[in-house]
């Protein structure tokens, strides 16, 4: 059955860090999805994720507003690119990477879709809380 998810029906959670908010529309918990996750993600100016990957899940990101910086490679920082409003970014399954809001003053807003039923995040850097390999809430 087709399902419409209105903004008020999305599940809002903190993302990978306090400066990231996920407004989850499609996931296993929201609509019973078995193979698709889709959310609007807002990141505060200057914020960035920890070094991570998404396991076997491919990721599509559409930049709605702002400018993003992505780094990737064996340690998550060897290569770099920026993406602006209107750009799509593809992140292959297993790609170790970091996402950052490249602006010091404007929020970054993206639509993120992944071919798995939840956010599926695997951290590699230990982070400030020492919580390696703990998936983010979906």
Which stretches of residues belong to each language-model region?
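A short, N-terminal "cap"/entry segment at the start of jelly-roll beta-barrel domains
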Residues: 1-36, 40, 50, 121-138
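Conserved hydrophobic/aromatic beta-strand scaffold that supports enzyme active sites
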Residues: 22, 38-42, 60, 80, ...
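Short strand-connecting beta-turns/loops that link adjacent beta-strands
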Residues: 31, 56, 75, 104-105
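Short, charged/polar surface micro-motifs in flexible loops or helix N-caps
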Residues: 31-34, 43-47, 65-69, 95, ...
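Residue-level signal for beta-strand positions within conserved beta-sheet cores that form or flank
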Residues: 34, 79, 106-107
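Residue-level recognition of conserved beta-strand positions in structured domain cores
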Residues: 40, 53, 72-74, 101, ...
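A short beta-strand-loop-beta hairpin characteristic of the jelly-roll/cupin
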Residues: 48, 57-85, 95, 100
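Ligand-binding loop in jelly-roll beta-barrel domains
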Residues: 84-85, 93-120
């Amino acid at each position: 059955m087709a399902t419409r998810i209105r903004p008020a029906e999305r599940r809002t959670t903190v993302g990978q860090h306090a400066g990231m908010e996920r407004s989850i529309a499609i996931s296993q918990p929201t609509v019973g999805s078995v193979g698709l996750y889709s959310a609007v993600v807002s990141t505060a100016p200057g914020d960035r994720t920890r070094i991570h990957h998404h396991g076997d899940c491919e990721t599509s990101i559409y930049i709605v507003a702002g400018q993003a910086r992505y780094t990737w490679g064996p340690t998550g920082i060897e290569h770099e690119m920026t993406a602006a409003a209107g750009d799509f970014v593809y992140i292959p399954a297993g790609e170790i990477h970091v996402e950052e809001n490249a602006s010091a003053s404007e929020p970054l807003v993206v639509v993120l879709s992944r071919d798995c039923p939840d956010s599926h995040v695997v951290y590699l850097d230990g982070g400030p809380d020492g919580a390696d390999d703990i998936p983010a809430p979906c």
